[in-house]
Amino acid sequence: MIPTVIEQSARGERAFDIYSRLLRDRIIFLGTQVDDDIANLIVAQMLYLESEDPEKDIYLYINSPGGSVYAGMAIYDTMQHIQPDVSTICIGLAASMGAFLLAGGAKGKRIALPHARIMIHQPLGGAQGPATDIEIQAKEILFIKNSLNSLLAYHTGQPLERIERDTDRDNFMTPEQAKEYGLIDQVITRRPQPSLAAVS
């Protein structure tokens, strides 16, 4: 069930679902596993907000266990492609692709709340079928792993060798540890201004 918000104006009452109301404040919420449907929605929202105002920041709140690498990369590439800075804010958990998207936010605008958790690891594989197909899938997994590690090294400033070592197994971090690692830039408790969008 998605809550609705009622707004009063001179023209009368208007009802919004909560996510549409947040979108008016340039807030996008990723609160599920990352799949193609969710990625398409988030990409569309980012493109819409860019068309509305290419100069104003977009705020991507993340509470996600991760999900599809391909779907996540569609979101990531759009974040880098559009003109507005995308500020990423971790609430709850940003794991796997969720952590990757968190790190991919605009430098200086990657945030976690104090009791959030961040987890990085290598991509998961599940190859089945004939040996030749498994070989193709194994090569693809290695390509994805190397790509993600290189991008994490870029966004965190960590050496590639350390990223490879630290993502070999599930690696959970507190916000303070994630800040020290370079995945985020700030740990905040309260927004500096009352506006929903004032977290930059």
Swiss-Prot record:
One of its GO terms (biological process) is protein quality control for misfolded or incompletely synthesized proteins. Its EC number is 3.4.21.92. It is found in: Cytoplasm. Keywords: Cytoplasm, Hydrolase, Protease, Serine protease. It catalyses: Hydrolysis of proteins to small peptides in the presence of ATP and magnesium. alpha-casein is the usual test substrate. In the absence of ATP, only oligopeptides shorter than five residues are hydrolyzed (such as succinyl-Leu-Tyr-|-NHMec, and Leu-Tyr-Leu-|-Tyr-Trp, in which cleavage of the -Tyr-|-Leu- and -Tyr-|-Trp bonds also occurs). GO terms for cellular component: cytoplasm; endopeptidase Clp complex. Coiled coil: none annotated. It comes from the Bacteria. It is an enzyme of class 3 (hydrolase). SUPFAM superfamilies: ClpP/crotonase. PROSITE patterns: CLP_PROTEASE_HIS, CLP_PROTEASE_SER. The active site is at residues 96, 121. Pfam families: CLP_protease. GO terms for molecular function: ATP-dependent peptidase activity; ATPase binding; serine-type endopeptidase activity. InterPro entries: ClpP (IPR001907), ClpP/crotonase-like_dom_sf (IPR029045), ClpP/TepA (IPR023562), ClpP_His_AS (IPR033135), ClpP_Ser_AS (IPR018215). Belongs to the peptidase S14 family. Cleaves peptides in various proteins in a process that requires ATP hydrolysis. Has a chymotrypsin-like activity. Plays a major role in the degradation of misfolded proteins. Fourteen ClpP subunits assemble into 2 heptameric rings which stack back to back to give a disk-like structure with a central cavity, resembling the structure of eukaryotic proteasomes. This is ATP-dependent Clp protease proteolytic subunit 2.
